[in-house]
Amino acid sequence: MTRLRKIIHVDMDAFYASVEQRDDPSLRGKPVVVAWRGARSVVCAASYEARVFGVRSAMPAVRAERLCPDAIFVPPDFARYKAVSQQVREIFLRHTDLVEPLSLDEAYLDVTEPKSGMELATDIARTIRAQIREETQLTASAGIAPNKFLAKIASDWRKPDGQFVIPPQRVDAFLLPLPVNRVPGVGKVMEGKLAARGIVTCGDLRQWALIDLEEAFGSFGRSLYNRARGVDERPVEPDQQVQSISSEDTFAEDLPLEDLGEAIVQLAEKTWNATRKTERVGHTVVLKLKTAQFRILTRSFTPERPPESMEELRDIALALRARVDLPADTRYRLVGVGLSGFRDKEPVVQGELFEH
């Protein structure tokens, strides 16, 4: 009989903004937005005081300013965030060696066989959160469940500064009424497609056969089928290394190529901010486009050295747009900007612009 796993997903609360408020007492209790100012900037993080006004990470900074005119904008300091993240990671490692960081502010922990000797995963999560608070003066939320999928959902249930457990015997009761938009990978576009088929909850999803979901949604259909049943066999992988990072945007209305510039700029900044959470560098810039007819194109470029700034990434992505050779009247429903070929910093050989 397979032993049930005990998985914890720990998510720091408004991490970047909370670090800024911790280090500058004048910011405490005020709406803080971590972002560079400017028409092309995007929000890296928002304090809970700013979130009350609808400010969210990854939204354009100009929109955040409109939503919350009194917000205090603070430029991100990734070196400082990385240092705090390392403190938190050392706390995790006191309890288990099976720690899979997802970014600077969140990680999965497999505590099926913990170092600390504590039997209950809820006690381990509570202890970890207390240690984080005591040693960093920051708060974290945690989800405890039999697998990664459920633990990640649970960590958002009692935010901020709380924890929530989904025991094995309660998985069905938890999932059946759960809205499908809480399932990772189900964004607004997919949510609309599911709703058009009468699928609003995971309980609705369970009424569909696997073959029908795969026919309707391709390979993602299998993921939907499994998640609706609480199935996720993915292990916690401590040595997992980032191979690619990308950001995508699906438009409400299809756009011509010349109108994609603003989206490319914002996605380049979002991707760049995500890469700052890793210790490696991406060498190849990738531009992804999907036409109104659902044709997917990618254009990529590997420069002599990896991009060293958001501006370099942005400029290469914009240059790749000029390499798209479809008819001028082609319209696009999705654009993505990414970095791939991640590796440790080392000299690289000049690449060439190429198309897929």
From Swiss-Prot:
| A GO term for molecular function | damaged DNA binding
Q: Which reaction does it catalyse?
A: DNA(n) + a 2'-deoxyribonucleoside 5'-triphosphate = DNA(n+1) + diphosphate
Residues recorded as binding Mg(2+), renumbered to this chain, are 11, 105
EC number, as in UniProt: 2.7.7.7
Enumerate the Gene Ontology biological process terms: DNA-templated DNA replication; error-prone translesion synthesis; SOS response
Cofactor: how and how many bound: Binds 2 magnesium ions per subunit.
Disulphide bonds annotated for this chain are: none
> Which InterPro entries does this one have?
DNA/RNA_pol_sf (IPR043502), DNA_pol_Y-fam_lit_finger_sf (IPR036775), DNA_pol_Y-fam_little_finger (IPR017961), DNA_polymerase-Y (IPR050116), DNApol_IV (IPR022880), IMS_HHH_1 (IPR053848), Rev_trsase/Diguanyl_cyclase (IPR043128), UmuC (IPR001126)
Give an example GO cellular component term for this record: cytosol
Primary role:
Poorly processive, error-prone DNA polymerase involved in untargeted mutagenesis. Copies undamaged DNA at stalled replication forks, which arise in vivo from mismatched or misaligned primer ends. These misaligned primers can be extended by PolIV. Exhibits no 3'-5' exonuclease (proofreading) activity. May be involved in translesional synthesis, in conjunction with the beta clamp from PolIII.
Q: Which family does it belong to?
A: Belongs to the DNA polymerase type-Y family.
Protein name (Swiss-Prot/TrEMBL) = DNA polymerase IV
**According to the entry, what is the taxonomic lineage of the organism?**
Bacteria, Pseudomonadati, Pseudomonadota, Gammaproteobacteria, Lysobacterales
